[in-house]
Amino acid sequence: MSIKISETLTFECETGNYHTFCPISCVAWLYQKIEDSFFLVVGTKTCGYFLQNALGVMIFAEPRYAMAELEEGDISAQLNDYEELKRLCVQIKKDRNPSVIIWIGTCTTEIIKMDLEGMAPKLENEIEIPIVVARANGLDYAFTQGEDTVLAAMAHRCPEQKTEIEKKIDDKSIQELFSFLPLKTKEKSNKSFTLKNTFSLVLFGSLPSTVASQLSLELKRQSIHVSGWLPAQRYTDLPILGDKVYVCGVNPFLSRTATTLMRRRKCKLIGAPFPIGPDGTRAWIEKICSVFNIETQGLEEREQQVWESLKNYLNLVRGKSVFFMGDNLLEISLARFLIRCGMIVYEIGIPYMDKRYQAAELTLLQETCKKMCIPMPRIVEKPDNYNQIQRMRELQPDLAITGMAHANPLEARGINTKWSVEFTFAQIHGFTNAKDVLELVTRPLRRNNNLENLGWTNLIKIQKR
């Protein structure tokens, strides 16, 4: 039986009545990733309460982030902003001595037009610690865009790649230094110099060190060396950028960073699908290999092995339907992976859609739908939650992947839910972590199966009558 499917993806845009976390929540994972950093959030009491409650870190634990709390005197311009921030930064230097201080701007600093970018260079010279300014405020579309803002700001601080003239001068000085060595040794050193003039690869996106190592290892198996990550584990190890550097993203919400790397740092962007799921990871590696003119080795077999290991999960999700309400900008990649697993995706709600940055991912989504003979899902940018609930009532999906604000009301209406924020903090990238994605997706489905086996669902139905 052949299923008639639409050839192209349909995009819609609604009013954007969505609820999400504030982008300053990026501090939660970035302060752990950049080990020698200190994050200073410049905002009001509300920002402080959010960080304190959402991150669950007590003050006495002395985490590597703090609040510079704005008071009435700051807002009415009675206090000197520069002196106040200087006092705090001097104290941070004395207590923690970080390699970099990252100022996180908030809605309030935007509204009162606080010139953080103007103050930072002057204060940086005084305290002799780099200060990076990132305006990760609540005016963004999704909370994950906070990381995008920080990485875009850090891209400006990456060391510059040396020009050909500078390289030749360095090479000449090294050759002169080793001029006493035999001729054969000099020839070998010349060969190594010419090899170093080729293009290098830098990956951008914050991932746990184990996942980053896994992706680097997968590329190493294809004879591709990753010269650096943005962000690096230490600020002092930021990657070298320049016109002979290829960059590739690992997350769909880093469009601002990609633009900065291309326009400001003259890097060349590799437009690849994102390494989420075995299919996405394979496509990501293949695209990078094609840019470096390298034929992939054993990648198809590697992907097949992963699919074989996921059989138990695939039997659970095959034929089930899912509805994405939109929360963290990972929706397109997750939907593509779940379609490949045999699920039907009714709708992909997404807070913001950069079609250029996600072009390769959208193409892979289209190809996956055709391969699986599944209708193309409708993609709704800035979805109206009220309209979404009406559509869900009609469609009755088996699972809704939603923000925390809507989870309980939907559960009360008999729709299984999964918090989208869990996918942000879980390890979902690469071949080996595909299992974790399906573990999260199938948890509510497995719970329902267990309740049915115990007879609880029948009891609930009787009570409702």
Swiss-Prot record:
Cofactor names from the entry are:
[4Fe-4S] cluster
Which residues participate in [4Fe-4S] cluster binding?
Answer: 22, 47, 107
Q: What is this protein called?
A: Light-independent protochlorophyllide reductase subunit N
GO MF terms on file?
Answer: 4 iron, 4 sulfur cluster binding; ATP binding; metal ion binding; oxidoreductase activity, acting on iron-sulfur proteins as donors; oxidoreductase activity, acting on the CH-CH group of donors, iron-sulfur protein as acceptor
* Pathway assignment: Porphyrin-containing compound metabolism; chlorophyll biosynthesis (light-independent)
- HAMAP family in the record, alphabetically? ChlN_BchN
One of this protein's Pfam families, by short name?
Answer: Oxidored_nitro
Keyword rRNA processing present in the record's keywords: the answer is no
User: What SUPFAM superfamilies is this protein classified in?
Assistant: Helical backbone' metal receptor
Keywords, ordered alphabetically: 4Fe-4S, ATP-binding, Chlorophyll biosynthesis, Chloroplast, Iron, Iron-sulfur, Metal-binding, Nucleotide-binding, Oxidoreductase, Photosynthesis, Plastid
The record's similarity note reads: Belongs to the BchN/ChlN family.
